[in-house]
């Protein structure tokens, strides 16, 4: 079976070369990219016992997933309109057949060599391979892991055991090195096919890959880490691409206790928060600084003021509401007074009675007093509600 796979691999690579022919690689990089984009294939295989296994596979360019694998149908899932790059339908069909054979027979070969490789059930294997284009050259990689620990890597046309991986890694590398065709095929896929496919992906998905979205930044308090201490949280949300630099600062000095963690948003932007635990008396003068490619070199700096953004927004809402009520009350009093005065003149335009001229003023005063009392009651109620946040 292994020989059959090798022959298929070799035929596929040779066929791919005959279709494409020798041609210079076209290198396309986003103008704003800080680092070269990496194309990466990930394969995770779980082995519960001698007869059960499960595989998951995906492909990524940078932090954006571009492909998946439907294990039921044995087909490639193209997750973006440009996921085919500049490969022809025939090339993609051939590679789909290649992966179908690989995912079908890889578990069999692992089961067959499990005892020799000292794999103990249940176990998991992780394989990561890909490339990146740097200027007019390319760099490639392939790494294997056993139970989450580094096992081996493919470097300069040879299989190398990872430092500290022991005799298990040595045995796996010996078997892989014995089959020279495996080394030749892997080398061709990594050094020739992968860079060309990556170049086509970058060109086809240029608008999405170069998308720049500025982050929104705000500060808040986190759960208290202890008496007399504060947890300061800097929220950075909605930015793209993913690379971002966030740090709590005091003046120009970085606060080394800063802890960060990021998660993706549904719109393929990112959210990150940076936390810092400090003594309450040391919070004065702290600020959160954010650097991102979308900002054009103009960093965002938010100074810690001791109040959460929620409380600030509540105060703003209260002030706006109060101003609105006062303006509306004043306008209503004026309109009511004008209507009453006009009514008195219409009823007796020549000789207005004394009590008629005084009545509108009396009504206006009563209305003003009632509205003023209502506004005062509302203000007292809001004040009691706000006191709960202190």
From Swiss-Prot:
- Sugar attachment sites are 49, 70
Give Gene Ontology CC terms: early endosome; external side of plasma membrane; extracellular space; Golgi membrane; late endosome; lysosomal lumen
Record protein name field: T-cell surface glycoprotein CD1e, membrane-associated
Q: Which gene encodes it?
A: CD1E
Q: Which CDD domains match?
A: IgC1_CD1
Q: Where is the Ig-like domain?
A: 215-306
Q: How does it assemble?
A: Heterodimer with B2M (beta-2-microglobulin). The association with B2M appears to be facilitated by the presence of the propeptide.
What are its GO biological-process terms? adaptive immune response; antigen processing and presentation, endogenous lipid antigen via MHC class Ib; antigen processing and presentation, exogenous lipid antigen via MHC class Ib; positive regulation of T cell mediated cytotoxicity
Transmembrane annotation, as ranges? 305-325
Any S-S bridges, and between which cysteines?
Answer: 131-194, 234-288
Q: Does the keyword Transmembrane apply?
A: yes
| InterPro entries in UniProt | Ig-like_dom, Ig-like_dom_sf, Ig-like_fold, Ig_C1-set, MHC_class-I_related, MHC_I-like_Ag-recog, MHC_I-like_Ag-recog_sf, MHC_I/II-like_Ag-recog
Biological role stated in the UniProt entry: T-cell surface glycoprotein CD1e, soluble is required for the presentation of glycolipid antigens on the cell surface. The membrane-associated form is not active.
Provide the taxonomic classification. Eukaryota, Metazoa, Chordata, Craniata, Vertebrata
């Amino acid at each position: 079976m292994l020989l059959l796979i090798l022959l298929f691999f070799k035929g596929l690579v040779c066929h791919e070369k005959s279709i494409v022919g020798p041609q210079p690689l076209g290198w396309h990089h986003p103008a704003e990219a800080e680092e070269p984009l990496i194309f990466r294939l990930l394969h995770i295989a779980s082995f519960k016992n001698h007869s059960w296994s499960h595989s998951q596979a995906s492909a990524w360019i940078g932090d954006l997933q571009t492909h998946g694998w439907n294990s039921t149908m044995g087909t490639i899932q193209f997750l973006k309109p440009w996921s085919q790059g500049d490969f022809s339908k025939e090339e993609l069909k051939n590679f789909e057949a290649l992966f179908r054979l690989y995912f079908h027979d890889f578990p069999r070969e692992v089961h067959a060599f499990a005892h020799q490789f000292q794999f103990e059930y249940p176990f998991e294997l992780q394989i990561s391979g890909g490339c990146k284009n740097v200027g007019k050259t390319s760099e490639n990689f392939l790494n294997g892991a056993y139970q989450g620990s580094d096992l081996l890597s493919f470097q300069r046309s040879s299989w190398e055991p990872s430092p500290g991986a022991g005799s298990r890694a040595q045995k796996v590398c010996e078997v892989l090195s014995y089959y020279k065709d495996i080394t030749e095929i892997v080398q061709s896929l990594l050094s020739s096919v992968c860079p060309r496919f990556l170049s086509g992906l970058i060109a086809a998905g240029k608008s999405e890959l170069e998308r720049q979205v500025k982050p929104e930044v705000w500060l808040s308090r986190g759960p208290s880490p202890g008496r007399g201490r504060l947890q300061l949280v800097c929220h950075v949300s909605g930015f793209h691409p993913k690379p971002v630099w966030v740090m709590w600062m005091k003046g120009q000095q970085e606060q080394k206790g800063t802890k960060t963690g990021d998660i993706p948003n549904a719109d393929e932007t990112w959210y990150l928060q940076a936390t810092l635990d400090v003594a309450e008396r040391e919070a004065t003068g702290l600020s959160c600084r954010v650097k991102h490619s979308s900002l054009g070199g103009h960093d965002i700096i938010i100074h810690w003021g001791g109040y959460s953004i929620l409380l600030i927004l509540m105060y703003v809402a209260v002030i706006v509401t109060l101003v609105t009520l006062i303006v509306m009350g004043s306008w209503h009093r004026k309109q009511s007074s004008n209507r009453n005065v006009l009514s008195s003149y219409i009823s007796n335009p020549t000789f207005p009675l004394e009590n008629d001229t005084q009545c509108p003023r009396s009504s206006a005063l009563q209305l003003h007093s009632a509205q003023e009392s209502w506004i005062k009651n509302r203000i007292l109620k809001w004040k009691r509600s706000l006191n709960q946040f202190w």
